[in-house]
């Protein structure tokens, strides 16, 4: 049985030239919500973008896949995220925190919804 892939809805196209690949450092703004709309985290509300290395397990697998456009065979038609892209990522539990969740904030097998904006790749 193959894993579900993230769902990606592009809200605003990026530059379509600057794409992150595994091992790159990305800077993003995000708002994380449960499917019921309850917000559990927000870099925007903290007033500071989030920086991480993608594709190396530093963040949830759904982010690693989405932010590096590394969807495998099943994701050939999924939208690509480039610098400047604003998107809504719907991350299934198998690509988020799975059956363990992060009690009491994120329950077991929760689907997560992130509004993300890719601000930069490797400082660009």
Swiss-Prot record:
Domain PPIase FKBP-type residues, every copy: 23-122
Main location: cytoplasm
Activity regulation text: Inhibited by rapamycin.
Catalyzed reactions per annotation: [protein]-peptidylproline (omega=180) = [protein]-peptidylproline (omega=0)
E.C. code: 5.2.1.8
Disulphides: none
Gene Ontology cellular component terms for the protein in this record: cytoplasm; extracellular region; fungal biofilm matrix
Keywords: Cytoplasm, Isomerase, Rotamase
InterPro entries, A to Z: FKBP-type_PPIase, PPIase_dom_sf, PPIase_FKBP_dom
Molecular function terms from GO: DNA-binding transcription activator activity, RNA polymerase II-specific; macrolide binding; peptidyl-prolyl cis-trans isomerase activity; protein folding chaperone
GO terms (BP aspect): chromatin organization; negative regulation of homoserine biosynthetic process; nonfunctional rRNA decay; regulation of chaperone-mediated protein folding; transcription by RNA polymerase II
Enzyme class: isomerase
Subcellular location: Cytoplasm
Pfam families to which the protein is assigned, alphabetical: FKBP_C
Family indicated by similarity: Belongs to the FKBP-type PPIase family. FKBP1 subfamily.
Function: PPIases accelerate the folding of proteins. It catalyzes the cis-trans isomerization of proline imidic peptide bonds in oligopeptides.
Protein name in UniProt: FK506-binding protein 1
């Amino acid at each position: 049985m193959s894993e579900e892939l993230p769902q990606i809805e592009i809200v605003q196209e990026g530059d379509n030239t600057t794409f992150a690949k595994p091992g790159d450092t990305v800077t993003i703004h995000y708002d994380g919500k449960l499917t019921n709309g309850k917000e559990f985290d927000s870099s925007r509300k903290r007033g500071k973008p989030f920086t991480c290395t993608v594709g190396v397990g530093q963040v949830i697998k759904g982010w690693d896949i989405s932010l590096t456009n590394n969807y495998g065979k099943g994701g050939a038609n999924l939208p690509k995220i480039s610098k400047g892209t604003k998107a809504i990522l719907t991350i299934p539990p198998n690509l988020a925190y799975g059956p363990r969740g992060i009690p009491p904030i994120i329950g077991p097998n929760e689907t997560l919804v992130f509004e993300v904006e890719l601000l930069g790749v490797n400082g660009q």
